[in-house]
Amino acid sequence: MMTAPKITFIGAGSTIFVKNILGDVFHREALKSAHVALMDIDETRLEESHIVVRKLMDSAGASGRITCHTNQKAALQDADFVVVAFQIGGYEPCTVTDFEVCKRHGLEQTIADTLGPGGIMRALRTIPHLWRICEDMTEVCPKATMLNYVNPMAMNTWAMYARYPHIKQVGLCHSVQGTAEELARDLNIDPTSLRYRCAGINHMAFYLELERKTADGTYVNLYPELLAAYDAGQAPKPNIHGNERCQNIVRYEMFKKLGYFVTESSEHFAEYTPWFIKPGREDLIARYKVPLDEYPKRCVEQLANWHKELEEYKTAERIDIKPSREYASTIMNALWTGEPSVIYGNVRNEGLIDNLPQGSCVEVACLVDANGIQPTKVGTIPSHLAAMMQTNINVQTLLTEAILTENRDRVYHAAMMDPHTAAVLGIEEIYALVDDLIAAHGDWLPAWLRR
């Protein structure tokens, strides 16, 4: 083994995300001298990231080197870790297209990056590019581990392990650890006092056990306290990011009905189910505080904030940041040093969750050490939770089959099975919507879709 790893970042123009991941990396002793290869097709964004990463490295006392690439294969050459974070088609034009076309057909969305027509189109745009990374990794860094942050996570991860089973990869999200911190904040307790066991699928995993440590060192079930706080109007607390549109009512109401708390946000969860967004039901939107068109609004705000932050970073002498909640540096450190850690990752269901389809993509706790990323067996999850997840897995199954077999019919079938879409549109309307989305996206989609 070399004395320091090579970390390749595909999509390095995502400057703020790069900053968070590499800020963590540079504060790990075993990774301080890593070779960081930044790759992006946008040379301007790439150079901006280079400036930020150099200042991060210097501020942390890291001694590695940085190289910048617009050629993917060159960036991947001899990599040990490959971090992937990009959005094919960006906010403009593709995200705008997903929202505007669906709205014309009477389908409202909130985020549209995981399921539904928005998630389906994003998967069709994205998976061919992920496959190209797998091709290049096979050729120039076959032993590397891919840390994938690209949505729609389940469909992307599934499509990669189906076609490139030899590539070591894990799909990463921050909803498990992020929601745990949110719930601790809602109850005014220290997040480090929590202990939990979580399982499911990406953006629809549930805390099967959620406990807090008491003064005498024993653990107690946190769910009764959480429910009491919600009923008393003491939870949820205002959005930590100051976003007044996202009030987290949907998840708490689902918690009351299901008995378990889901990991992904209310604005996400509202569009994974058939109950919250319906034409002419403004009462539901008002009652559950569902933020329609949230993702486009967020993109505009984040872009403005990013430009402001970037200017500050470019003029700053040093950049000091707090550790993030992302798992990437934890995984790299554990694989590189052998120091064991536990993370939550999206992986192939091979006997992990008994009552979800084998081969589907599930989110479970994984032990990480010198032996690799080792998912842990969960067993059987509560039947009502599995039933809800299955409605989402249906879409993932059909879309993955569509792109693996180049079968346009399965794209329609995936949209038909989407819980939210099916609750709003008839069959012919769904077909017309898919046709319009494919036409509107044009060359952003694979050529076989337009044959």
From Swiss-Prot:
CC terms in the record's Gene Ontology section: cytosol
Keyword entries, A-Z: Carbohydrate metabolism, Glycosidase, Hydrolase, Manganese, Metal-binding, NAD
InterPro entries: GH4_Enzyme_sf (IPR053715), GlycHydrolase_4_CS (IPR019802), Glyco_hydro_4 (IPR001088), Glyco_hydro_4_C (IPR022616), Lactate_DH/Glyco_Ohase_4_C (IPR015955), NAD(P)-bd_dom_sf (IPR036291)
Name of the top EC class for this enzyme: hydrolase
Binding site for Mn(2+): 173, 203
Named cofactor requirement(s): Mn(2+); NAD(+)
Active site: 174
Chain residues that bind substrate: 151, 287
Free-text remark on how the cofactor is bound: Binds 1 Mn(2+) ion per subunit.
Gene Ontology molecular function terms on file: alpha-galactosidase activity; metal ion binding; oxidoreductase activity, acting on the CH-OH group of donors, NAD or NADP as acceptor
Pfam families: Glyco_hydro_4, Glyco_hydro_4C
Gene3D superfamilies the record matches: AglA-like glucosidase (3.90.1820.10)
Binding site for NAD(+): 5-71
Catalyses which reaction(s): Hydrolysis of terminal, non-reducing alpha-D-galactose residues in alpha-D-galactosides, including galactose oligosaccharides, galactomannans and galactolipids
A biological-process GO annotation: carbohydrate metabolic process
Superkingdom, taxonomy of origin: Bacteria
UniProt keyword Membrane, yes or no: no
E.C. designation(s): 3.2.1.22
Assembly mode: Homodimer.
Similarity comment: Belongs to the glycosyl hydrolase 4 family.
Name under which the protein is recorded: Alpha-galactosidase
Organism: Salmonella typhimurium (strain LT2 / SGSC1412 / ATCC 700720)
